[in-house]
């Protein structure tokens, strides 16, 4: 198989389920699991992943926005869904119809939920978001929380089914993480004193590994489900990005390669051209930094990554030929390029790497 249209992103659903099982074993029944499928399941396909997780025992799912919740309900997903992000008025109203829980952190959202619940003669579900240090969304400070809890007394159709926070640096700053945790504990005490009994959740993937003092009633694995982190032993990357060469030719000593002439051959080099580029999600910054796998060997990306093509040095792979699979992310033989490794090359994080190949020009294949 050669030529354009050769690019494939293979999503290993078995790996995602095994990662879910790995998290289950890690928490050992001490807490529940809310599987995070936001951002198209981190680029893996929100509906396919959600269906597989529900089938394999996931009891609750988390998304970022209401559109994602609609996708899941339209696909027949029945388990509880929590919208972790803020929503527009129309979106907040829709969560009531969807029987999804909406993150709430201000009076406006609370009033919208109350009005819509009354209109539909239903109970709206809300998860109270506490800002303990992200300074993004959430109720911040004791006074603001007290005011919101006071308003909640006048919203009998809104059930506080959950409350949550998010840690800013669970993988890098233990002291600040503990500070955030103490703030969340204080907020939980205030909520309980006001008569609410929500389940609490705070730990995403890195915080799960931090320790069980952060687990509360439920944890929220996201990146861990897709193998984009090694914070828990035994996780496996679920994506494999492949292509096939469209040209293999020799460059002479002194030839320059690609836009800007950023790479100069210092010897005769065998160059493989691969039809994938930043138009497909393979980042431009990876030029002269990244590697790919050809015939089980690591080959350097030489020259700039173009919109539609990149070039590899395959001089040390004399048997490389047209028709050989090129692995840009994932395993080939004993070698493996992980999302974390690619993230280092790209000066980013594995999350962005995995989300980057959600392109119409890269065919997604489930296995």
Spans of features found by a protein language model:
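Conserved helix-loop functional segments at active or binding sites
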Residues: 22-25, 254
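Active-site-proximal beta-alpha core segment in soluble small-molecule metabolic enzymes
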Residues: 2-11, 15-18, 25, 29-199, ...
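Active-site anion/phosphate-binding pocket segments in diverse small-molecule metabolic enzymes
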Residues: 1-17, 67-68, 87, 105-113, ...
């Amino acid at each position: 198989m050669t030529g354009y249209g050769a690019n494939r992103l293979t999503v290993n659903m078995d790996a995602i389920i095994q990662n879910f099982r790995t998290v289950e074993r890690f928490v050992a029944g001490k807490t529940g699991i809310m599987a995070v499928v936001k951002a198209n399941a981190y680029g893996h396909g929100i509906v396919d992943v959600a269906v597989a997780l529900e089938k394999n025992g996931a009891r609750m799912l988390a998304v970022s926005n209401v559109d994602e919740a609609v996708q899941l309900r339209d696909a027949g997903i029945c388990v509880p869904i929590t919208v972790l992000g803020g929503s527009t008025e129309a979106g907040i109203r829709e969560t009531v119809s969807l029987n999804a829980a909406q993150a709430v952190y201000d009076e406006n959202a609370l009033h919208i939920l109350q009005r819509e619940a009354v209109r539909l003669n239903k109970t709206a579900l809300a998860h109270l978001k506490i800002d303990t240090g992200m300074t993004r969304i959430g109720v911040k400070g004791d006074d603001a929380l007290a005011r919101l809890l006071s308003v909640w007394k006048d919203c009998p159709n809104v059930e506080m089914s959950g409350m949550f926070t998010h840690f800013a640096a669970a993988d890098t700053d233990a002291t600040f993480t503990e500070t955030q945790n103490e703030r969340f504990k204080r907020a939980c005490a205030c909520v309980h004193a006001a008569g609410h009994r929500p389940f609490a959740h705070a730990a995403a993937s890195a915080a799960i590994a931090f320790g069980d003092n952060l687990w509360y009633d439920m944890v929220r694995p996201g990146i861990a489900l897709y193998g984009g982190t090694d914070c828990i032993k035994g996780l496996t990357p679920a994506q494999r990005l492949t292509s096939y060469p469209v040209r293999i030719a020799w460059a002479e000593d002194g030839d320059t390669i690609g836009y800007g002439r950023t790479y100069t051959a210092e010897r005769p080099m065998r160059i493989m051209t691969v039809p994938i580029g930043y138009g497909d999600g393979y980042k431009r910054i990876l030029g002269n930094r990244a590697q790919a796998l050809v015939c089980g060997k690591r080959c350097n990306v030489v020259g700039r990554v173009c919109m539609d093509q990149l070039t590899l040095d395959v001089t040390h792979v004399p048997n490389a030929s047209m028709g050989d699979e090129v692995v840009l992310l994932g395993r080939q033989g004993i070698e493996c390029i992980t999302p974390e490794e690619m993230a280092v090359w790209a000066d980013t994080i594995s999350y962005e790497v995995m989300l980057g190949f959600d392109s119409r020009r890269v065919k997604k294949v489930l296995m």
